[in-house]
C-alpha cells in the first residue's frame, strides 16, 4: 500500500500493526519443528503486534523470511540480541543454547532472561554434548573485559541454570547436577569470576543434595559482595553519592540477604554465621567509620554502647 504525504512524497505503508503467520500442525510435527508429545500445544497461527511507527529493511526481511519459509527450515534469533530486535516473536521462542528457535508454541516470558520455552532433551544435548566451549577454562588464556562481557551478554550461565531447573522439575536430578557442574567446568570461576547470575545455583544445588558445591559457591559470592561493600565503605561521602555506587551497595546487601536465607534454610548455620560476621565487620557499631556516622551507635567515653 502506498501513502502520499503532505509534501507529495510517496511512502510504502502497511495499514495494520497486527500480522499473523499460519501454522500447519501436521507439517511442523512431521519435520520435527515440534515433537509429537507437544502437539496439543501448537497454536493455529503466530500473532505478532508490530511496535513503533516504521519498519526498517532488516525487520521487513525477518517478516518476509517467516512468511515465505512456511516452516520448511528452522529459523533462529541470536540469544545476545536486545528485546527490540525480536519484534514480538519472543513469545514463540524455544531456547536451544546460543539461539532461540521460532516454534508454533506460545509462552509468556516475564522478563528478558526467561525468553524461550525449554525442551530439556534438545537443550541438554546441545550444551552438554554438541557445543564446543573452546579454551575458556585454560588458565593460559586471558579472558579480558571484552570476553567477560560477551559471556555475560550471551547468558551462558543462566542458560545452564534454566536447563537444570527444568530437569529438576522433571525429576531428572542427575542430569540437573551434571548441567550445573558443566557450567562451572566450562566457564570456571578462576577465569570468569563469580557474578550474581550464579545466585540461584545455590538453592538448586542444596535441593539436589549437593551441599558442598552449594556452600563453596555461596562463600564465593559472599566474599565478592563483601569486598564490594568494604570498598564502598572506604569512600568519602561525596564519592558514595556519585554514579551507581549507592545502587551497587544496595545490590550487594540484597545478595547477602538472599545468601543467608538460602544457607540458613539448608541448615548450614556455621557458614551463615561466617558470612554474617564478614558483613558485621563492616557495619560493626564499635568500629566507628569516619565517613558513615549514621550507621554507628552512640558510644560513651567508657566504651559502652547506648
Task: Label each residue range with its predicted role.
Residues 1-306:
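ER/secretory pathway lumenal C-terminal domains and tails of membrane proteins involved
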Amino acid at each position: 500500500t502506498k501513502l502520499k504525504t503532505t509534501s507529495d512524497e510517496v511512502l510504502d505503508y502497511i495499514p495494520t500493526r497486527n500480522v499473523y503467520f499460519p501454522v500447519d500442525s501436521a507439517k511442523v510435527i512431521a519435520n520435527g519443528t515440534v515433537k509429537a508429545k507437544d502437539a496439543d500445544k501448537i497454536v493455529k497461527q503466530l500473532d505478532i503486534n508490530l511496535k513503533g511507527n516504521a519498519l526498517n529493511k532488516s525487520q521487513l526481511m525477518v517478516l518476509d523470511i517467516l512468511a515465505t519459509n512456511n516452516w520448511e527450515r528452522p529459523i533462529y534469533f541470536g540469544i545476545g540480541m536486545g528485546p527490540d530486535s525480536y519484534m514480538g516473536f519472543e513469545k514463540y521462542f524455544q531456547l536451544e543454547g546460543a539461539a532461540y528457535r521460532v516454534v508454533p508454541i506460545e509462552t509468556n516470558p516475564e522478563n528478558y532472561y526467561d525468553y524461550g520455552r525449554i525442551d530439556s532433551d534438545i537443550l541438554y544435548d546441545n550444551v552438554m554434548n554438541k557445543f564446543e566451549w573452546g579454551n575458556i577454562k585454560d588458565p593460559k588464556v586471558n579472558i579480558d573485559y571484552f570476553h567477560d562481557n560477551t559471556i555475560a551478554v550471551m547468558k551462558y550461565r543462566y542458560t545452564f541454570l534454566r536447563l537444570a531447573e527444568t530437569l529438576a522439575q522433571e525429576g531428572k536430578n542427575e542430569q540437573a547436577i551434571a548441567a550445573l557442574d558443566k557450567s562451572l567446568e566450562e566457564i570456571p570461576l578462576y577465569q570468569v569470576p563469580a557474578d550474581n547470575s550464579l545466585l540461584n545455583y545455590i538453592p538448586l544445588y542444596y535441593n539436589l543434595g549437593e551441599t558442598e558445591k552449594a556452600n563453596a559457591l555461596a562463600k564465593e559470592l559472599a566474599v565478592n559482595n563483601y569486598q564490594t561493600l568494604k570498598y564502598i565503605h572506604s569512600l568519602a561521602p561525596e564519592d558514595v553519592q556519585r554514579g551507581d555506587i549507592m545502587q551497587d551497595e544496595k545490590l550487594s546487601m540484597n545478595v547477602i540477604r538472599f545468601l543467608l536465607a538460602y544457607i540458613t534454610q539448608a541448615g548450614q548455620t556455621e557458614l551463615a554465621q561466617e558470612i554474617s560476621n564478614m558483613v558485621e565487620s563492616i557495619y560493626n557499631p564499635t568500629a566507628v567509620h569516619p565517613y558513615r556516622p549514621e550507621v554507628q551507635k552512640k558510644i560513651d567515653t567508657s566504651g559502652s554502647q547506648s
